Amino acid sequence: MILEGSFLATIVKMSDKLKRVTTPNPAPTSAHDLANDLATAFRGYPAGVAILTTMGAAGPEGLTVSSLASVSAVPAVVSVSLGNGSTTLATLTEESRVIVHMLDADRADLADDFAVPGADHFAGTEWAPSAEGAPRLEMQGPILHGFVQSMTDTGSATLIAVTIDRIEAGNCHAPGLVRMAREWHEIPR
């Protein structure tokens, strides 16, 4: 009983101290400054690199992404954010088939190729249509097959949720590829 009273007394004291702590109001930040600060913060944040591909009416489309995130294991869902000016985004609709190619360090050249807006990303790149019709790049890393579940406009970008229905495990032991400070970096697995 004494322990309970001591514990409760400690909690009450801590609660009183927390009530007295105040947070200063930061100076307002302009939208432009906030956007620059956010870009600077994420420039120093290492992010895995992938290529998202889909088949559009005019042929295969794809781009390099560093915004890939796992959302849910059951059901298997990942997300990616695409700039609203992206030609790949323009071809996507809900239910579109897509493939997410998770890149190993030895494919930084492919990441560079698919990062150029408006370029013919598939010229000189080995690929074939998957069983579902999306462009599958020839590579060794994990490959996630799925379809667009939802698309949410967030301002200058669109957040895309992709339901994964098939995975090629690939080589999970090769060094990984991350993007940080506008450069590719190899990391051991």
Regions found by a protein language model. Give the residues of each.
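Basic, polyanion-binding surface patches
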Residues: 2-189
